[in-house]
C-alpha cells in the first residue's frame, strides 16, 4: 500500500506555486489513499538566501518563514483532527548552500569585435550552474592584472573557456577588467560541481575558509 507522497518541482519557487503544491498533495492523499499518509515530502525548489544584487532580479523571493506558513500551516490545519498526523519532509539542498559557494576565476584574454569585448576566463558556465543562463551573478574583482588590454565598460561579455556561444557567464559586465584580473562570482552552489563535465578542463579544486581565515582544500582538482 502507498504510505507516503512525494512531489519535486524545480521551476516554481513562488509562494503561490507552493500553496498549489501542498493543496494538490493533500487532495491526492484524501482522494486516493485509504488512510492518512505516514509522510508527505514536498521536495525542494525554494528560494534561499541571496546577495541583494541577485535577489533584486526576482519579483518576490519568499523567506523560509513564508514557505513554512504556507506548507506547514496548511498541512497542520488539514490534519488538525487526525489522530496520527503525517510527517512533513522537505529537501532544500541547493536552497541552503547556493549562496555559500563562489567561483574564483582569472581573466585569460580580451578580444574586441566591433564594439563588443569578449573576456575569456579560465572556467566555464558549467562551473557556475545554470543560474547564469537566467540571472546576473553577484561578483567581486581582485585587480591583479598586468596586461595592456582592458575591456570596454558595459559592452563586455565574460566568456568561458569552451569557446561555445552559450558559454557566457555574464552578459554586459558593468566594469572594466584586464588580463590577469581575478573575478569571484557568488551564489554558484546549484549543481555546479556535479554537473560539470570533464570537457576542455577537469573540475577545479574546492577550498573552504575556516573561521580563522585559513584555506583548507576539501576537494582536490580532478584529473583525467
Predicted regions: what they are:
Residues 1-109:
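Active-site loop/helix belt of alpha/beta enzymes
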Amino acid at each position: 500500500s502507498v504510505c507516503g507522497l512525494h512531489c519535486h518541482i524545480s521551476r516554481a519557487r513562488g509562494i503561490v506555486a507552493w500553496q498549489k503544491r501542498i493543496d494538490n498533495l493533500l487532495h491526492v492523499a484524501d482522494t486516493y489513499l485509504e488512510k492518512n499518509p505516514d509522510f508527505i515530502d514536498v521536495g525542494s525548489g525554494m528560494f534561499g538566501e541571496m546577495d541583494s544584487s541577485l535577489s533584486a532580479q526576482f519579483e518576490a523571493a519568499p523567506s523560509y518563514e513564508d514557505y513554512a506558513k504556507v506548507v506547514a500551516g496548511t498541512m497542520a490545519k488539514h490534519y488538525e483532527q487526525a489522530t496520527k498526523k503525517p510527517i512533513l519532509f522537505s529537501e532544500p539542498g541547493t536552497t541552503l548552500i547556493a549562496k555559500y559557494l563562489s567561483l574564483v576565476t582569472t581573466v585569460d584574454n580580451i578580444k574586441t569585435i566591433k564594439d563588443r569585448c569578449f573576456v575569456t576566463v579560465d572556467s566555464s558556465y558549467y562551473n557556475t550552474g545554470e543560474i547564469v543562463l537566467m540571472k546576473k551573478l553577484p561578483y567581486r574583482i581582485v585587480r591583479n592584472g598586468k596586461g595592456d588590454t582592458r575591456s570596454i565598460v558595459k559592452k563586455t561579455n565574460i566568456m568561458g573557456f569552451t569557446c561555445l556561444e552559450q558559454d557566457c557567464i555574464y552578459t554586459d559586465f558593468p566594469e572594466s577588467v584586464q588580463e590577469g584580473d581575478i573575478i569571484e562570482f557568488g551564489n554558484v552552489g546549484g549543481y555546479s560541481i556535479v554537473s560539470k563535465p570533464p570537457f576542455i578542463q577537469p573540475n577545479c579544486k574546492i577550498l573552504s575558509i575556516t573561521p580563522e581565515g585559513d584555506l583548507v582544500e576539501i576537494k582536490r582538482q580532478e584529473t583525467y
